[in-house]
Amino acid sequence: MSDIAPAAHSPYIPPTPEVGLPLWLLAELTYRCPLQCPYCSNPLDFARQGQELTTEQWFKVMQEAREMGAAQIGFSGGEPLVRQDLAELIAEARRLGFYTNLITSGIGLTEEKIIAFKKAGLDHIQISFQASDEQVNNMLAGSKKAFAQKLEMAKAVKKHGYPMVLNFVTHRHNIDRIDKIIELCLALEADFVELATCQFYGWAHLNRVGLLPTKDQLVRAEAVTNEYRDQLAAQDHPCKLIFVTPDYYEERPKACMNGWGNIFLTVTPDGTALPCHGARQMPIQFPNVREHSMQHIWYDSFGFNRFRGYDWMPEPCRSCDEKEKDFGGCRCQAFMLTGDAANADPVCSKSYHHGIITQARDESETATQTIEELAFRNDRNSRLIAKSS
């Protein structure tokens, strides 16, 4: 396929693509963020990343992705609210026909902005919390005002007719209070609540020993969640509780992103295109939207084709009868834990490196690291990490 970008009004799409369409576009607008969450999935060296894409460059990305079949866009970061052109980007995404999501901490959000985003056509707002009580929330966020701001904005989102979607990242320091978390969500009249146990990428991987819950903590938390689900169902209550367990307590890997470069496409603040938001850490030269069309990136680039299909797989994945279900698991996790992204995801009990996972489980039983001892995601720490790498 040619490297020349096709005409904007008539992009070439293979009649029967060998891969899926990029249905889900994650627009990481910025790595700037007022919070310092120690489980952030942003790269450790975010402080040395390049200049952010301009408004016009994001318009081009969205148009090309939409013409290729992308249906849903998530505006993320960092904190996307620091971008002064966010309402413009939302309006353009709506004009192009995207279903639009704003994934935010709520810091920097105001009622005036909510109204402006509604007018621009925003479909969905997800607000994240760090904990159910102010002290722990603010300690994890690195901000003394974060909790009060989040509460106020969650209520404002509901007031202006959006479905209330709340996200709580749970870990060993807050998971034992999952009942309080759910009660807070019900008090805020949440429609959907994602109780997402920490996934260990980026800063969370760096802090894994201090964040990974024990097996007993997870079992109790899921039992409490199921009790609330039963109560809500009996009351015909509309709130839906989604409980996400960490990979580290599974015996089979997830079908990460439904397969490498299959439906999901991330564009980072500097324009680097990735098949998942954690892939930047790999020793692979990924394409940039400043230099290539989205068409070329998705279908022709080495980075997006590197782990498509099954031919790249070594054993035990190559001969495994489950490979079409899980695609060998997460490539980023394989790279982080074994140093080779082509290895089987160590989460899988068939992996030759599964002992790394069982060792992490054992370490969680005796871990003593406090919140204060975690490495917080901020510019200073990022620069130190970048300097030492």
Swiss-Prot record:
Cited InterPro entries: 4Fe4S-binding_SPASM_dom, Aldolase_TIM, Elp3/MiaA/NifB-like_rSAM, MoaA_NifB_PqqE_Fe-S-bd_CS, PQQ_synth_PqqE_bac, PqqE-like, Radical_SAM_PqqE_MftC-like, rSAM
Subunit: Interacts with PqqD. The interaction is necessary for activity of PqqE.
Gene Ontology biological process terms, A to Z: pyrroloquinoline quinone biosynthetic process
Organism: Pseudomonas syringae pv. tomato (strain ATCC BAA-871 / DC3000)
Pfam families: Fer4_12, Radical_SAM, SPASM
Domain Radical SAM core: 19-234
Residues the record lists as binding [4Fe-4S] cluster: 33, 37, 40
Alphabetically ordered keywords of this record: 4Fe-4S, Iron, Iron-sulfur, Metal-binding, Oxidoreductase, PQQ biosynthesis, S-adenosyl-L-methionine
Gene: pqqE
Reaction equation(s) it catalyzes: [PQQ precursor protein] + S-adenosyl-L-methionine = E-Y cross-linked-[PQQ precursor protein] + 5'-deoxyadenosine + L-methionine + H(+)
Family listed: Belongs to the radical SAM superfamily. PqqE family.
Function: Catalyzes the cross-linking of a glutamate residue and a tyrosine residue in the PqqA protein as part of the biosynthesis of pyrroloquinoline quinone (PQQ).
PROSITE patterns (UniProt xref): MOAA_NIFB_PQQE (PS01305), RADICAL_SAM (PS51918)
Co-factor remark: Binds 1 [4Fe-4S] cluster. The cluster is coordinated with 3 cysteines and an exchangeable S-adenosyl-L-methionine.
Cross-referenced SMART domains: Elp3
Disulfide bond entries: none
Pathway of action: Cofactor biosynthesis; pyrroloquinoline quinone biosynthesis
Keyword Glycoprotein: no
Taxon lineage: Bacteria, Pseudomonadati, Pseudomonadota, Gammaproteobacteria, Pseudomonadales
EC number: 1.21.98.4
Protein name: PqqA peptide cyclase
A GO MF label: iron ion binding
Necessary cofactors: [4Fe-4S] cluster
